[in-house]
């Protein structure tokens, strides 16, 4: 049976958006992210980061630096009881990329490539899954992939997005939605979701 995932954009959802984050000393986790992820894990969601990384394409930092930062962030999350199942990133940009990084790619949101990779590689049901983003491109990717629910965390995107989504001001609102949704599902089915034991990232 396929599992469900909580897809998280990184910059602006997991960490505070500062623009092309690549240094440990610049990382500030978004308020509520640890509690949200722990609750999602308890409700049976796999935790998957899906992030556009145009900073790699532009030459601001390389893939090794990105992976090193993600390893450190993974350790910080783990210290708070949070285990990531996977991190998918797109290092390409169709206009501002340098060399081989200047190209269109289905992984770059609003493309659905990263979501579909997770579906295949992690056996995730997209129609049972949820995405949290802070930009319209996140919402478009979620809608195109047929995700059950998309959330837009207010603060980064300056205009209203098209498509189906719920806009929230804090991650705590999404945590409460997940809890209510789980209660409704359990009431309908009479079954209780089990906790997933994700592998360490």
What are these regions (language model features)?
Residues 19-21, 54-57, 94-95:
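A short, flexible beta-alpha/helix-coil linker loop
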Residues 2-46:
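Active-site neighborhood of HAD-like aspartate-dependent phosphohydrolases
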Residues 2-4, 64-86, 95-131, 135-201:
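Asp-based, Mg2+/Mn2+-dependent phosphohydrolase catalytic module
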Residues 8-10, 51, 133-134:
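Active-site flanking residues adjacent to catalytic metal/cofactor-binding acidic residues
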Residues 46-52, 85-90, 152:
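Short beta-strand segments at enzyme active-site cores
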Residues 14-17, 91-100:
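Short, basic/glycine-rich phosphate-binding loops at helix/coil junctions
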Residues 53-66:
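A short secondary-structure junction motif
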Residues 19-28, 62-64, 101-105:
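Short glycine-enriched, charge-decorated loop/helix-capping segments at active-site entrances
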């Amino acid at each position: 049976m396929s599992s469900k995932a909580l897809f998280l954009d990184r910059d602006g959802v997991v960490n505070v958006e500062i623009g092309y984050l690549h240094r440990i000393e610049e990382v500030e986790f978004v308020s509520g992210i640890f509690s949200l992820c722990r609750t999602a894990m308890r409700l049976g969601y796999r935790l998957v980061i899906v992030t556009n990384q145009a900073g790699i394409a532009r030459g601001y930092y390389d893939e090794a630096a990105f992976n090193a930062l993600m390893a450190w962030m993974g350790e910080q999350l783990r210290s708070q009881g949070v285990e990531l199942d996977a991190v998918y990133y797109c290092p390409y940009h169709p206009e501002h990329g340098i060399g081989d990084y200047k190209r269109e790619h289905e992984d770059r949101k609003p493309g659905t490539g990263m979501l579909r990779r997770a579906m295949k590689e992690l056996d995730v049901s997209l129609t049972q899954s949820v995405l949290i983003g802070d930009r319209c491109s996140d919402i478009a990717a979620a809608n195109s992939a047929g995700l059950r629910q998309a959330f837009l965390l207010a603060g980064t995107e300056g205009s209203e997005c098209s498509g189906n989504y719920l806009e929230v001001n804090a991650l705590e609102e999404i945590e409460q939605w997940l809890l209510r949704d789980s209660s409704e599902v359990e009431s309908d089915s009479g079954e209780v979701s089990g906790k997933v034991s994700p592998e360490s990232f």
